[in-house]
Amino acid sequence: MPHQVRWLALASLILPAAVAAAPAYVAVPLGNLGGASIYGTGINARGQISGWADTDGSGAAHRHAFLYSDGVLTNLGTLAGGTQSFGYAINDAAQVAGSSNSGNTTSLHAVIFQGGTILDLNVFLGAQVSNAYAINAGGDAAGASRSGASFRAYRYSAAGNAITTLSTFGGTTSQAYGINVFGALAGFAHTDAEDAHAFRYTDGGGLVDLGTLGGRASIGYGIAPGGEVVGSAYLPGDLGPHAFIDDGTMHDIGTLGGGSSTAFSINAAGTIVGESTDAQGSSRAFVYASGAMVDLNTVTSGLGGSTLTTATAVNDAGQIVAMSCTGPLQCQQAYRLDPAPAAKVAAIEYHHAAFDHYFITAIPDEIAKLDSGVFAGWTRTGGSFNVYAADQVGAMPVCRFFSTTFAPKSSHFYTPDPRECAIVRANANWQLEGLVFNIPVPAADGACPANTAPVYRLYNNGVGAAPNHRYTTSLATRATMIAAGWIPEGYGPDAVGMCAPV
């Protein structure tokens, strides 16, 4: 959010909310660039997808990076004179991180495709070979480059075109595959025994070895705004590997009944996607949510007989990139999996007269307890707005927090902004209660998407030594609160915080 969260007072009023299980999906085929193979790699908040595809019958010799947007698959080309390019990740500005060769060399250079131009990151890396595997909202990229015998992970900072080169855990090689909004990285680095170990890198904490699940090796592929890393790691006896999530401790998230699995991507809600073998040893794409791994083939319509074998990316709206492949990187169909339309429910506003605090909820059990007086002192204001009860294309999950710092006064804080959510989570005074509903978000100028209404966010500036926020779709209510000294927070001149579906 443009306005940083003021550190509010939250007192525990309501039971933590459960995160919804994986929804059903509808498959949208991406098409091709004229060849037989296509591979999708990344997806942004708008549902645009990066990847690469064969452009003719020559196969890998003429694979080009692509951008899929609004039903159109666009060939992003190569550096001047090149024959190959690859797209590995995409941000909300439709910048695609990848690599390309050129007429001057057959070696690949890390690049960023942006608006019809190609930025050669090798100008700043000065390497023999380089790749850009990840990119964040600020245009910072991560990958690996080689100037001698071994690759080293790097981070490219768009501000100043600065390069940060990572070390290893005593071995020769490191590579970065993921970057989050704060510039934290995920990847792997070799130990002195030349075993690959997954890492998390932050400016404050440096390069942290995440270890394994008991075996010799692990790799990190994705990193969430909160710093959680996903990837794959070997079990004792080097069995596996199994997909993992590391939130400070590495957790095995299992398989679909087979011997191996890999997690490639995680979103702000903690939804994970990847691939796993099933009980018959066949590769299947999976989604992992609410503690359960689900075969995407069992919850997806519109596949036309194809079998999804891998899923490589998931955005915060729950849209997934998945492929049907016959071998490693030999994929004949790529899809965007859109969550089936979610039900709209009302978020009801309550007021506590003694505290002069406001609270909203869309959770039926909470509404029933508030209305029946189980939670004393709260009454309906008559205000409400619509939200989605589950993942919805074009909507973001909303984090809900509380803190006992200013008890007994009670307040809750809500944000659909992954960056803001991660900032609040990092503060020891706050507790994340859950992801309580999904809602569209405004553009930077405060404009809401079609068929939605602005939800204004207002802050009481700590009146009564217990800060509180109010969320309303009413311009009259907004004006009244501002006249009473409340401060508008959000996007654009009207400080819009969310956009309620109508």
Model-based region annotation:
Residues 1-22:
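Sec-dependent, cleavable N-terminal signal peptides
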Residues 342-502:
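Extracellular glycan-binding segments that recognize GlcNAc-based cell-wall polysaccharides
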Residues 13, 20, 26, 233, ...:
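Compositionally biased, intrinsically disordered/low-complexity regions enriched for serine, proline
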Residues 5, 19, 26, 32, ...:
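A generic alpha-helix propensity feature with a strong bias for hydrophobic helices
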Residues 21-341:
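Residue-level hotspots at or immediately adjacent to binding/recognition sites across diverse folds
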Residues 11, 16-17, 29, 69, ...:
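Generic secretory/membrane-interface signal
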